[in-house]
């Protein structure tokens, strides 16, 4: 069974002709959401859909799918993730990573102390932020910047970082 990776969420329907509103979560929307591409709805079992049309509307991507021409056909997909298989992933430039590669990394600071494991990645602005939960303390929100992340070893599943002063509040 292939691995699937999230590329967006169907947040609602649009009109009555089977169009859906998608909140895109991929860095490659033009590649992922092309007419003719196959995407999968995270249902059980997965539902394969062929994209029939793509357009932008009020900050969201609107999609229609081949053979889905009525709102009642797509309504069950509301709130579900859209996914692609690993074979649809493209090679990245050096120093770029898929979220799937970062989530689960053990993060070690400049003193050699383990801060924890990345369990989520936020995209609040110009750079991503790694979320590293800590037992009984507030999460560490580590910015993904060259000045902070010194090295990533995907084979060892570890990232070495320099923690900016004041970033970790151990008082709580």
From Swiss-Prot:
Residue ranges of domain PRC barrel in the record: 94-167
> Which keywords annotate this record?
Chaperone, Cytoplasm, Ribosome biogenesis, rRNA processing
Task: Select a single GO molecular function from the record's annotations and give it.
Answer: ribosome binding
Q: Which domain of life is it from?
A: Bacteria
Report the principal subcellular site. cytoplasm
Q: GO CC terms for this protein?
A: cytoplasm; ribosome
Looking up InterPro entries in the UniProt record yields: PRC_barrel-like_sf, PRC_RimM, RimM, RimM_N, RimM_N_sf, Transl_B-barrel_sf
Q: Where in the cell is it found?
A: Cytoplasm
Asked if the keyword Nucleotidyltransferase belongs to this entry, the reply reads: no
| Single GO BP term | rRNA processing
* Complex formation: Binds ribosomal protein uS19.
Fetch the NCBIfam families from UniProt. 16S_RimM
Q: What does this protein do?
A: An accessory protein needed during the final step in the assembly of 30S ribosomal subunit, possibly for assembly of the head region. Essential for efficient processing of 16S rRNA. May be needed both before and after RbfA during the maturation of 16S rRNA. It has affinity for free ribosomal 30S subunits but not for 70S ribosomes.
Similarity remark: Belongs to the RimM family.
Annotated domain remarks: The PRC barrel domain binds ribosomal protein uS19.
Can you say what this protein is called? Ribosome maturation factor RimM
Source species of the chain: Lacticaseibacillus paracasei (strain ATCC 334 / BCRC 17002 / CCUG 31169 / CIP 107868 / KCTC 3260 / NRRL B-441) (Lactobacillus paracasei)
Q: Which gene encodes it?
A: rimM
